[in-house]
Design a protein with these regions (language model features):
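Residues that scaffold the ATP/ADP-binding catalytic core of kinase and kinase-like folds
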Residues: 13, 29, 117
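Charged phosphate-binding loop/patch that engages nucleotide di/tri-phosphates or the phosphate backbone
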Residues: 107, 111-137
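Active-site-adjacent beta-strand/loop module that shapes the phosphate/pyrophosphate-binding cleft
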Residues: 58-95, 107, 129-130
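N-terminal strand-loop-strand
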Residues: 1-21, 70
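Non-DNA-binding regulatory cores of transcription-related proteins
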Residues: 98-104
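Residues that flank catalytic or metal-binding motifs in active/ligand-binding sites
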Residues: 15-17, 66, 102
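Short loop segments at secondary-structure junctions
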Residues: 6-8, 73-77, 111-113
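The catalytic Nudix box helix
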Residues: 21-56, 70, 110
Length: 137
C-alpha cells in the first residue's frame, strides 16, 4: 500500500497514525476520479501507475470531509516524490508565512504495517483493499 507522510512542522516527529492516501479536494464540478488522478500527480510529482483503477469507496474524516479512493496495481518509485506546496503561518501567530510541502515522503507498506501508519479514518480503505485481494469482495 502506497502511503504519504504529511509535510510541515506539525508532522516532523509524528509517524504512526498520520500517514495518508494521496488525496485532495475537488475543484468546482470536477469528476472525482479526475480529481484523484490530479491530486496524486500534484502530491507525488508524477501520475499514478497506468492500470485499471478500482474504487475503494468513501470514508469520512474527523473534519467531516469525505474521501473517495481508488486503487491501482503498479510500480511507483517513491524516491522521486516531489510534492506541491502550500502557505502556512509558522510559527503559529507569528504573522510569518512559509511554504510547506503537502507531503514530505511516500513509502510502500504491507497491509499490516499500513494499518499502524494510516490515519484511523482511512482504515476502511485498507479493509476494502484486503477484501478485494482475498477475492472475497
Amino acid at each position: 500500500m502506497l502511503l504519504a507522510h504529511p509535510g510541515g512542522p506539525y508532522y516532523v516527529r509524528k509517524d504512526d497514525g498520520v500517514w495518508t492516501v494521496p488525496k485532495g479536494e475537488l475543484e468546482g464540478d470536477e469528476d472525482p476520479l479526475a480529481a484523484a488522478v490530479r491530486e496524486f500527480t500534484e502530491e507525488m510529482g508524477s501520475p499514478p501507475p497506468a492500470g485499471e483503477l478500482v474504487a475503494l469507496g468513501e470514508a469520512r474524516q474527523r473534519s467531516g470531509k469525505i474521501n473517495l479512493v481508488w486503487a491501482v496495481e503498479g510500480d511507483f518509485d517513491v524516491t522521486g516524490v516531489r510534492s506541491n506546496t502550500f502557505p502556512m503561518e509558522w510559527p503559529p501567530r507569528s504573522g510569518r508565512t512559509v511554504q510547506v510541502e503537502e507531503i514530505d515522503r511516500a513509502e510502500w507498506f504491507d497491509l499490516a504495517t499500513a494499518r499502524v501508519k494510516i490515519r484511523k479514518a482511512q482504515l476502511p480503505f485498507l479493509d476494502r483493499l484486503a477484501e478485494g485481494l482475498d477475492g472475497s469482495g
